[in-house]
């Protein structure tokens, strides 16, 4: 058992309540309408709703998409913080998971692709969190267009890798759980995209709900790594470094055995 088990749990525990707080602040500040509202108007006159209570008149601009919830201050400040801190945690989790797979299995293109997808997901999160949709729409949509598909690709590949390195019945059970979460993520992301491009009030509201389901699902998926991270040690990161060093030592036409002996001799000489 190591302290790394706290990392994926922290990402889930920090991010899920965090974005709900952002949503609650946006609703109370009349920046979006509550998710349970299904009635929208083309236009609204001055809304006389009291401060601290949800809006009574909603338009298409008030649909509670996650991006809209984090557009205006003060909730935009918390939204950016969650995006930045969450992205940093995602990168560390992806690096640890990459190293852990190498430690128990051989290097594979699936593992490398999963690492790239996870880091790309983190980069997109930074853009989404720091470029609000109403002020930098192009950059915000680029970030979302990068973060969401990359996040989906990461969970897909991670689910496959879970089965490849499974060693116990509990490992396979966790693989089944991750596949279920991946299916939910795939369906919700596709539906969110389909609904979002429609101009109907109902479709836009459904897009917001699907977007929330997707994000919450991905955060829960990251939290499942707490199970494997209990076995992370100093040898875990060294496994990735040694694998990289071994590959860099290889030269065309040289045998595997002679190459390893040559590299080991070089390391000893350096010491």
Swiss-Prot record:
Topological region Extracellular: 25-75, 130-140, 204-205
Membrane topology: Multi-pass membrane protein
InterPro entries reported in the protein's UniProt record: DRAM/TMEM150_Autophagy_Mod (IPR050911), Frag1/DRAM/Sfk1 (IPR019402)
UniProt subcellular location: Cell membrane
A GO CC term attached to the entry: plasma membrane
GO biological process: phosphatidylinositol phosphate biosynthetic process; protein localization to plasma membrane
Membrane-spanning ranges: 4-24, 76-96, 109-129, 141-161, 183-203, 206-226
PANTHER family recorded: FASTING-INDUCIBLE INTEGRAL MEMBRANE PROTEIN TM6P1-RELATED, TRANSMEMBRANE PROTEIN 150A
Function text: Regulates localization of phosphatidylinositol 4-kinase (PI4K) to the plasma membrane.
Full protein name: Transmembrane protein 150A
Organism: Xenopus tropicalis
Gene of this entry: tmem150a
């Amino acid at each position: 058992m190591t302290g790394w088990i706290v990392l994926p749990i922290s990402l889930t525990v920090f991010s899920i309540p965090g974005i709900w707080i952002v949503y609650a602040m946006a609703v109370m500040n009349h920046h979006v309408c509550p998710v349970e509202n299904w009635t929208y108007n083309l236009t609204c006159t001055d809304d006389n709703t009291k401060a601290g209570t949800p809006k009574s008149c909603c338009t298409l601009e008030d649909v509670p998409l996650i991006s809209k919830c984090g557009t205006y201050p003060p909730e935009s400040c918390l939204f950016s913080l969650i995006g930045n801190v969450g992205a940093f945690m995602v990168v560390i989790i992806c690096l640890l998971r990459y190293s852990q797979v190498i430690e128990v299995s051989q290097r594979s293109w699936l593992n490398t692709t999963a690492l790239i997808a996870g880091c790309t997901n983190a980069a997109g999160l930074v853009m989404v969190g720091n470029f609000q949709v109403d002020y930098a729409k192009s950059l915000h949509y680029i970030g979302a267009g990068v973060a969401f598909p990359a996040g989906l690709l990461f969970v897909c590949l991670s689910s496959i890798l879970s089965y490849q390195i499974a060693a116990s019945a509990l490992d396979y059970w966790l693989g089944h759980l991750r596949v279920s979460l991946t299916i939910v993520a795939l369906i919700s992301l596709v539906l969110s995209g389909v609904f979002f491009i429609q101009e109907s009030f109902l479709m836009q509201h459904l897009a917001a709900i699907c977007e929330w389901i997707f994000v919450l699902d991905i955060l829960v998926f990251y939290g499942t790594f707490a199970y494997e991270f209990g076995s992370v040690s100093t040898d875990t990161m060294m496994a990735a470094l040694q694998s990289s060093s071994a590959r860099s030592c290889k030269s065309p036409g040289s045998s595997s055995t002679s190459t390893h002996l040559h590299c080991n001799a070089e390391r000893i000489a350096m010491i």
